[in-house]
Amino acid sequence: MRQQELIQKLLAGADLSAQEMEACIDSIMENRFTDAGTGAILALLQKKGVTPTEAIGAYENLMTRVTPITLPAHAVDTCGTGGDHRGTFNISTAAAFIAAGAGVPIAKHGNRSITSKCGSADVLEALGYRVDLPASATEEQFRETGFAFLFAPLYHPSMKAVASIRRELGIRTLFNLLGPLINPAKVKRQFIGVFDPSVMELYADVLIHAGCQHAMIVHGKTEHGDGLDEASVSGPTTIIELFEGRLCHHTVNPEDFGLNRWSIDELAGGDAETNAQIIRQILDGSATQAQIDAALFASAITCYVSGMGSCIDEGMSMSKESLESLAAMENMNRIIEVNNRLAEECNTHEG
């Protein structure tokens, strides 16, 4: 479909088929559309609202473009969509280290900050972790530690084609929507926090299409009723659970799992150094109880999604043991040590 034809169709409010969307993304990534045309298409899709069928078409095209990496499909990705503007610390990153300390294999896909002060890549770097390892070294990192961070720009080089257009538009687009769904390792277990509850069903549809085995898609509320892309310790959390092709809907509260309810202000983060310090304090037990509870809740869900915990309650027990035994802290230190060694080896080989 030609650029002008596509724009006219979207202006009329019409939806695209999966094949049309796949062809559209192909034309965008191969620079067959003008920058103005691509910007118009992305803005019109955002205004209309992306359908599950359109998201699946875009997903299919983007996954053909990833830099390949081979990690076990049973590894778990923990991530959020961002965009809630609540300024919390990096809860899903802290949770990933707690779950890893409990033996859960982690393949976390992430990026630098887009809508917050500090993205997962930023806080990992502040902890001393090198996010720029090539795929082969990242595979070795996972073999040695059961943990890998997949830095989005390294695995989605085709995104450079739209980087300046997205920056100039200054709005969330289809690419922000798909970010949490396009883990290059094609993991089959995911814990995803979304700030906009209207996309939860869409995420479930794409994950079913992708063959995801077990996923928890969550949307939390603060005590003021504002949305969070986290499991909330400040209010209720709505969950869509996907397990082997079947969907279940739940609403849970922190008290259901023995956690206290805290004000969202208690979970405030800052820049990368501040958030790295919060994560260290959570893992060594010196953080506030609010910070610990938020990380425990996310880790408990991660343990459950991994299949190592039979329910969130069991995941909570695993997570508390990981923290209280200092396994999470010791494991994080080892992960960073191995990561730094592999980075040095890469530098030596390049030199």
Curated annotation (Swiss-Prot):
GO terms for molecular function: anthranilate phosphoribosyltransferase activity; magnesium ion binding. Keywords: Amino-acid biosynthesis, Aromatic amino acid biosynthesis, Glycosyltransferase, Magnesium, Metal-binding, Transferase, Tryptophan biosynthesis. Its EC number is 2.4.2.18. Binds 2 magnesium ions per monomer. 5-phospho-alpha-D-ribose 1-diphosphate binds at residues 80, 83-84, 88, 90-93, 108-116, 120. It is an enzyme of class 2 (transferase). Mg(2+) 2 binds at residues 229-230. GO terms for cellular component: cytosol. Anthranilate 2 binds at residue 166. Pathway: Amino-acid biosynthesis; L-tryptophan biosynthesis; L-tryptophan from chorismate: step 2/5. The keyword NADP does not apply. Pfam families: Glycos_trans_3N (PF02885), Glycos_transf_3 (PF00591). Gene3D superfamilies: Nucleoside phosphorylase/phosphoribosyltransferase catalytic domain, Transferase, Pyrimidine Nucleoside Phosphorylase, Chain C. It catalyses: N-(5-phospho-beta-D-ribosyl)anthranilate + diphosphate = 5-phospho-alpha-D-ribose 1-diphosphate + anthranilate. Its cofactor is Mg(2+). GO terms for biological process: L-tryptophan biosynthetic process. Mg(2+) 1 binds at residues 92, 230. Belongs to the anthranilate phosphoribosyltransferase family. Catalyzes the transfer of the phosphoribosyl group of 5-phosphorylribose-1-pyrophosphate (PRPP) to anthranilate to yield N-(5'-phosphoribosyl)-anthranilate (PRA). Homodimer. This is Anthranilate phosphoribosyltransferase. The lineage of its organism: Bacteria, Pseudomonadati, Chlorobiota, Chlorobiia, Chlorobiales.
